[in-house]
Amino acid sequence: MNTQLINNQWQAGQGPAFASINPSNGETIWQGNGASAEQVNSAIKAARAAQLQWADTPLEQRITILENFAAQLKEHSEEFAVIIAQETGKPLWETRTEVGAMTGKVAISVKAYNERTGTTENPMPGAKAFIRHKPHGVVAIFGPYNFPGHLPNGHIVPAILAGNTVVFKPSELTPHVAQFTLSLWLKAGLPAGVINLVQGEIETGKALAAHQDIDGLFFTGSSNTGHLLHKQFAGHPGKILALEMGGNNPLIIKDVNDVSAAVHDIIQSGFITSGQRCTCARRVFIENSSNGDAILAKLISATKNIVVDDSFATEQPFMGAMISEKAALGMVAAQNELVAKGAEVLVELKQLKPGTGFVSPGIIDVTNVNDMPDEEHFGPLIKIYRYSDFDSAINEANNTSFGLSAGLLADSENDYNHFLKRIRAGIVNWNRPITGASSAAPFGGIGASGNHRASAYYAADYCAYPVASVESDKVTLPQTLAPGLIIE
């Protein structure tokens, strides 16, 4: 199978064979060979050869091609949603929203480019001052598996818009989505070499990240991989590195009158996408009060009733399969480890079908666990903390090396204002699920969740660098020379 796109030419990979498995049924839906180091090098060379001409292409023409891409997404939206569902196990209703987000990214990126990295002009005595922005050059983009279309798209669209060329390395778990995405870019009329695709596993990624001729790398994925990339780039200050990693995200509930609404937002925060969003609530803090008891009781009941089923079930489920059986078994193991530390299972997370990624959502009370690991358990397992003091709950919420998302469900605006001042996270929501983030706002975290390169609306910032200029249309001798200077 031709799995690599280099200089607008599809070709077979020359590296190790790998396959993509539908986590809902264990069937192989894609197979091919990864890119060799030589093919990675060829992709970077193609991107380098195309970069200057692409940067010189008028902005209006670049925008037209991006709009063509958005039109292709609309035209093929259902086919694309089906491919994402097959490869990730997510319900079809959710993958349809992912394709919609990809389509909307184009207009948002154009707006962000003009607002944040366009050209500004200011008068000054005898000259004009300009601020312009230039592309970095050739950038590598690493994509994750949980949103294999939308999240890499959030790097690719603004990077190409700014005049960069791209070498894209998707997750080895979602190669079919990547291949389909690139086919739409070709249909949109993107010139040869502007975007290149190198598929493969860890060796392909290493060859791309270590290549001397990339000018930057944009990454969305696990904290462990992000930290390795950060160390690797530490000796290369001339290369731009944008990291969007995970989180051990807290959600605090305090004095909420509408118990059902609170339970809804907890479930949306913890279990959407089978808990495989980097913004999902991992830790939920519930008051030691009658209100807290009522919320927890209803949460337990509602969690037991969550429908988990195939992506294409006629009656659509809330949760589909996790990305793989390995991921599902990893969540079962994480739950067992917490039980061994003294946690109490309130709703057991179980693998529902051997050979698949299907698990039931779980709730576990960790209030009495003294040595809680600061880990992102990337799946549908909510850890409950009961608290009596609001400030102590906030302090414990901040007791993490991560800092991606956080939220408060509370009827009091004063409580929220206090929470907002004290909590450490890049995304902070009030009375909304903490998985809710807008593409028209920055998306990023602090601490182990990123390196201060927020994506989404602020992706424009890391896709181009500023150039400051003072300009005059002719050389002019000042009427008054500086002291000690004589020009005759």
From Swiss-Prot:
This protein's UniProt keywords: Arginine metabolism, NAD, Oxidoreductase
Active site: 244, 278
EC number(s) stated in the UniProt entry for this protein: 1.2.1.71
Pathway in which the depicted protein is active: Amino-acid degradation; L-arginine degradation via AST pathway; L-glutamate and succinate from L-arginine: step 4/5
GO molecular-function term, one example from the UniProt record: succinylglutamate-semialdehyde dehydrogenase activity
Pfam families for the chain: Aldedh
GO biological process, any: arginine catabolic process to succinate
Listed CDD domains: ALDH_SGSD_AstD (cd07095)
Residues reported to bind NAD(+): 221-226
Purpose: Catalyzes the NAD-dependent reduction of succinylglutamate semialdehyde into succinylglutamate.
Family: Belongs to the aldehyde dehydrogenase family. AstD subfamily.
Record-linked NCBIfam families: arg_catab_astD, PRK09457.1
Name recorded for this polypeptide: N-succinylglutamate 5-semialdehyde dehydrogenase 2
